[in-house]
Amino acid sequence: DGALRLWTWTRDGLLPVAGHWSSLDAQSLALPDGVYTTLRTYGGTRVVGLGSHLQRLVESRRLLGADCNLDVAWLRAGLKAAIAAAALPEARLRITVPLSCAQAWIGAEPFVPYTAWL
């Protein structure tokens, strides 16, 4: 439908978060402090450099003194679930992970290509 969407990913699964935001940036301001990465999908489900995105989250949390290790396989599963739920041909996604390990937030919006002059 083209709407900006937000989910919380916990050990219980992917749950939609109600709200209205103008952008992923505005959405991020409503979330707890943590680390984030922004990426895009290609062909609906492919993400280039996903391992690097996830490693940056792990490293950023470590540098900030997070008291638990980020389960990358768990986070990958959440991203896969959010991509499927978004059902967009191409999407821009933001994964936000607080310093606690209880949950993550995944926001999605339709990807809009940059103009040719860029």
Give the ranges of each region predicted by the language model.
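Conserved alpha/beta cores of soluble small-molecule-handling proteins
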Residues: 1-118
